[in-house]
């Protein structure tokens, strides 16, 4: 029986690619037309990939190539950690691992508001209790700014035992490094993989737009907390 608050209609997205339609695929002409389209339209109509928003900064991001199901990260892989701090806006902490081929695997995220530096540091330690220590741990530069006589946000976080160092401030260089990692090689694939439980990072990578005033950067007014943490890591 229907309940008062039940939706009248539901939708389910079923992705479809040209390869799913043998008639159109074998004609050849339709495929040539799709290949000539701009990148975003081509990805949608030829590859059935509707993840990327119009004007998104990372149009090469693709769930098939870049998102994987979680697994137990081997202890022999080097661990890395990066964080972008916010209080009224979210803080994001990302945990990654580098395998022996320098592929970067993002396996955990923390996305949380209204945490002081010491509170965030304690939460980080709790979440990584069973992890090997990271070889690199970086935190946004603004967290090191001193606004009064007390400890900075970075000092409060480090006091908990996390031990961050300042992240590279160069926004353009970090974005370019991420583009390199997202690039898909026909034989080896991409050298960045993101666990499917990192939902906020995936959301931002599919939607964050380019800046309207600087085409080399993203729009800093958009939700970019997980993106910034990833940029620091790259």
PLM-predicted stretches and their roles:
Residues 1-23, 29-32:
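ASCE P-loop NTPase helicase motor core
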Residues 16, 46, 93, 137, ...:
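A residue-level signal for conserved active-site and pocket-lining positions in enzyme catalytic cores
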Residues 21-85:
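ATPase catalytic-site recognition across NTP-hydrolyzing enzymes
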Residues 90-97, 231:
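Short beta-strand scaffold segments in enzyme catalytic cores
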Residues 24, 54-56, 70, 89-93, ...:
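Short acidic/glycine-rich loop or secondary-structure boundary segments that cap or lie
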Residues 217-234:
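Acidic, Mg2+-coordinating catalytic module of metal-dependent nucleases/exonucleases
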Residues 12-16, 81, 138:
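Hydrophobic/aromatic beta-strand patches that form the interior of the parallel beta-sheet core
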Residues 100-219:
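Mg2+-dependent endonuclease catalytic cores in nucleic-acid-processing enzymes, primarily RNase H-like
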């Amino acid at each position: 029986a229907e309940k008062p608050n039940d939706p009248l209609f539901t939708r389910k997205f079923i992705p479809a690619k040209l390869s799913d339609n043998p008639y159109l695929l074998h004609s050849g002409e339709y495929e040539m037309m799709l290949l000539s389209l701009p990148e975003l339209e081509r990805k949608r109509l030829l590859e059935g990939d509707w993840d990327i928003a119009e004007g998104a900064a990372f149009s090469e991001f693709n769930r098939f190539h870049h998102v994987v199901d979680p697994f137990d990260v081997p202890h022999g892989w080097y661990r890395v950690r990066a964080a972008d701090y916010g209080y009224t806006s979210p803080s994001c902490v990302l945990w990654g691992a580098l395998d022996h081929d320098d592929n970067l695997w993002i396996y955990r995220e923390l996305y949380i508001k209204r945490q002081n530096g010491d509170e965030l540091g304690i939460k980080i330690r709790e979440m990584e209790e069973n992890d090997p220590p990271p070889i690199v741990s970086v935190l946004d530069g603004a967290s090191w700014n001193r606004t009064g006589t007390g400890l900075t946000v970075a000092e409060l976080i480090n006091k908990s035992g996390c031990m961050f160092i300042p992240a590279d401030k160069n926004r353009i260089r970090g974005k370019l490094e991420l583009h390199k990692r997202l690039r898909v090689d026909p034989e080896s694939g991409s050298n960045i993989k993101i666990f499917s439980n990192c939902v906020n990072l995936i959301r931002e990578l599919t939607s964050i737009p380019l800046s309207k005033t600087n085409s080399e950067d993203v729009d800093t007014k958009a939700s970019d907390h997980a993106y910034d943490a990833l940029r620091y890591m790259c």
